[in-house]
């Protein structure tokens, strides 16, 4: 879900924080991409003309594999090196949200069945997309595909967005890539959005700079986390009557969530704002401040030659893809992943940093106990096909 209304607030109060780029201008960058969010997008967007998911002759869904293969090729062709980060175990506080999502999917499934009988094609398509869920099998197949492509894979102990942010903070990648704005709440210095969108959408890449966002909002990191929780996050019920404008006003007026909650408790129903009886915001804040992640210095990322025979076996023989297209895709991977990229021009200049309006408060780093990809073994936690190519190309 991300953070409700945050993009609009940043556009209004911190416009310098948001820049748009053509994908080709990001050559030389390494990016940690939220895999689960990307796979979800592919399952929704990569469809047949009738709106149904792509399948092979055996009736197996292939939308996620088709999307992942060709969108990753596009990213690599533009000189970007992606690493895909998969979700681990969700925080306990998130279980309520996940349960409600399941209920909504079941409702959409029932409405979809009714639409097949009495509704239009558009109704059926709409309800079908609302029932989409990324399954364990989807994740396993995508990890297998990425390993065969020579793309690094990380399985986070918990939230993928938090792990993406950790790798960006630790200098393993330049940016985190996700549609979820809570990646910023996990303290990602740079967030790329729309990176895995279809080229046909002609949607530019949106780059959001956390430092500029904090300066524009005139907040420190602790206050920013409070604002995001108040706007509405994955861990708590939203407060009725609180929208983006009122959330920003409350945080500025009371300095943080502690003062806001005290005010709302003492003035129940004030201006229609009603805080739930059970609203453990302190627990939610701890998840954002000290997420369960693999420390960046224990993760190495390596991009290697694709396993062409393995790709043909998996995509062509098992999943029914076109062999010629798969082989051509593998050639592109080999060419672009292992070519010596021209250095970025901005790497030759030192930029004098602007004075901070409000410095971000330090965010602690919890050492995660999550598992790493099965291929990852060694003195350090190695991910996918890994060695020493870990620093971002500035």
From Swiss-Prot:
Keywords, in A-Z order: DNA damage, DNA repair, DNA replication, Endonuclease, Exonuclease, Hydrolase, Magnesium, Metal-binding, Mitochondrion, Nuclease, Nucleus, Phosphoprotein
Cofactor: Mg(2+)
Subunit relationships: Interacts with PCNA. Three molecules of FEN1 bind to one PCNA trimer with each molecule binding to one PCNA monomer. PCNA stimulates the nuclease activity without altering cleavage specificity.
Residues where DNA binds: 47, 71, 159, 232, 234
Similarity comment: Belongs to the XPG/RAD2 endonuclease family. FEN1 subfamily.
Organism annotation: Laccaria bicolor (strain S238N-H82 / ATCC MYA-4686) (Bicoloured deceiver)
Stretches the record annotates as Interaction with PCNA: 341-349
GO molecular function: 5'-3' exonuclease activity; 5'-flap endonuclease activity; DNA binding; magnesium ion binding
Compartment(s) where it occurs, according to its Swiss-Prot or TrEMBL record: Nucleus, Nucleolus; Nucleus, Nucleoplasm; Mitochondrion
First-tier enzyme category under EC: hydrolase
Post-translational modification, as annotated: Phosphorylated. Phosphorylation upon DNA damage induces relocalization to the nuclear plasma.
Taxonomy, superkingdom: Eukaryota
PANTHER family found in the cross-reference section: FLAP ENDONUCLEASE 1 (PTHR11081:SF9), FLAP ENDONUCLEASE FAMILY MEMBER (PTHR11081)
Gene3D superfamilies: 5' to 3' exonuclease, C-terminal subdomain, 5'-nuclease
Entry EC number(s): 3.1.-.-
PROSITE patterns from the UniProt entry: XPG_1, XPG_2
Cofactor note: Binds 2 magnesium ions per subunit. They probably participate in the reaction catalyzed by the enzyme. May bind an additional third magnesium ion after substrate binding.
GO cellular component, one term: nucleolus
Location of the region described as N-domain in the Swiss-Prot/TrEMBL record: 1-105
GO biological process terms, semicolon-separated: base-excision repair; DNA replication, removal of RNA primer
Region (I-domain): 123-254
This protein's name: Flap endonuclease 1-A
InterPro entries, alphabetized: 5-3_exonuclease_C_sf, Flap_endonuc, HhH2, PIN-like_dom_sf, XPG-I_dom, XPG/Rad2, XPG_CS, XPG_DNA_repair_N
């Amino acid at each position: 879900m991300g953070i409700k209304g945050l993009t609009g607030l940043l556009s209004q109060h911190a416009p310098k924080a948001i820049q748009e780029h053509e994908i080709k201008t990001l050559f030389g960058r390494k990016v940690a991409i939220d895999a689960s969010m990307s796979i979800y997008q592919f399952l929704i967007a990569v469809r047949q003309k009738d709106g149904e998911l792509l399948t092979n002759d055996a009736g197996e869904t292939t939308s996620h594999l088709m999307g992942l293969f060709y969108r990753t090729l596009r990213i690599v062709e533009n000189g970007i090196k992606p690493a895909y980060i998969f979700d681990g175990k969700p925080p306990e506080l998130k279980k309520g949200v996940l349960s409600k999502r399941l209920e909504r999917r079941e409702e959409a499934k029932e409405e979809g069945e009714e639409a097949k009988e009495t509704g239009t094609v558009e109704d059926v398509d709409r309800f079908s997309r609302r029932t989409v869920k990324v399954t364990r099998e989807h994740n396993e197949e995508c990890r297998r595909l990425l390993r065969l492509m020579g793309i690094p894979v990380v399985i986070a102990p918990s939230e993928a967005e938090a792990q993406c942010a950790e790798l960006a903070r630790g200098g393993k990648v330049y940016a985190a890539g996700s549609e979820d704005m809570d990646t910023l709440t996990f303290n990602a210095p740079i967030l790329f959005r729309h990176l895995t969108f279809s080229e046909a959408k002609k949607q530019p890449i949106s780059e959001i700079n956390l430092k500029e966002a904090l300066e524009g909002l005139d907040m420190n990191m602790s206050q920013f986390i409070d604002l995001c929780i108040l706007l509405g996050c994955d861990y708590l019920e939203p407060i009725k009557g609180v929208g983006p404008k009122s959330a920003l006003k409350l945080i500025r007026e009371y300095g943080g969530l502690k003062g806001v909650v005290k005010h709302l408790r003492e003035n129940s129903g004030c201006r229609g704002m009603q805080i739930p009886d059970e609203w453990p915001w302190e627990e939610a804040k701890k998840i954002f401040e000290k997420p369960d992640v693999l420390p960046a210095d224990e993760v190495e990322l390596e991009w290697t030659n694709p396993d062409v025979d393995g790709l043909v076996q998996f995509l062509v023989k098992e999943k029914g893809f076109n062999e010629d297209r798969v082989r051509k895709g593998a050639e592109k991977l080999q060419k672009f992943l292992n070519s010596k990229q021209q250095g970025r021009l901005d790497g030759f200049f030192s930029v004098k940093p602007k004075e901070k309006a409000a410095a971000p408060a330090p965010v602690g780093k919890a050492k995660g106990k999550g598992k790493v990809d099965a291929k990852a073994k060694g003195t350090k936690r190695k991910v996918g096909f890994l060695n020493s190519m870990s620093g971002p190309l500035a």
